Amino acid sequence: MRKYRFTFLFIVLVQLIGYTQEKDIEIELLKKLDSISRSNSIARHFASLYFETTVLSINFFANADPAVKNFIERLENNFAGFFFRSADANFNKTGIPVVWQSYFRDSTLSPLQYKLLGINAHINGDIWQALTSEFSAEELMKNRMTYLRFQKGLQKQYQRFYDEYVSSNLKTGLVNNTTLGLSRIYGKIMLSRWRKRQLRLAILYHTDKIKFEDALSNLNRKREELNRLILRNL
């Protein structure tokens, strides 16, 4: 897996150098994720998965029109900042954002638990914040289909991730075998629902603060319930 990651880093960096200086942002993003993934920090577990997903996103939108690429690049850069700041807070022993506290609280979890906790924190805790701090309601509604378009790419990444951890983890393997593979399908559906919910939440943030607060409270409760399931059952 590490060789796979370095190979893609080399390919992507070479491709990006040939484009405009705006691509420097993506180069720096990949370099920082790769650096964290090679560190001794427990942040490395999610960073390695995040690196692969970012490469996938860059390649997925490589031939998109400038407006689409601009939206995705702005989102990627702002979104990643939430993970980086949480990792830095853990390293510096300062206050870790609430959505990442379950991830960094225990240094003895399995790589699978860290990756699942990271996915839960980043998707169910960070996306709406990245969307609202970077885009207006009008921009979000205008770029709704661009945001949702990447779901196809994420499903490929989920498939790869699922195949890897099911083959190496007895409990998740048993779950898959006893449900005839439905847990694989269910995971893809939930990933899509989570991302759509984050977009709706971001639009509510700009348009209806009362409904937003109710939806956010419900989301926070579900996120913490999922964290407990990950910690207790895997």
Task: Give the role of each language-model region.
Residues 98-161:
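Active-site-proximal alpha-helical scaffolds that flank and shape metal-associated catalytic sites
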Residues 1-22:
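Bacterial Sec-dependent N-terminal signal peptides
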Residues 24-37, 56-59, 99-105:
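Short, charged/polar, low-complexity loop and linker segments
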Residues 69-70, 108, 139-188, 195:
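Extended, low-complexity, amphipathic alpha-helical coiled-coil/linker regions that act as scaffolds
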Residues 33-37, 57-65, 86, 90, ...:
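Secondary-structure edge/capping motif, primarily at the C-terminal ends of alpha-helices
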Residues 37-86:
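N-terminal interaction modules that seed assembly of large macromolecular complexes
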Residues 69-77, 86-95, 107, 115:
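N-terminal amphipathic/basic membrane-interacting segments and domains
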Residues 24-28, 182-234:
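A cross-kingdom marker for long, charged
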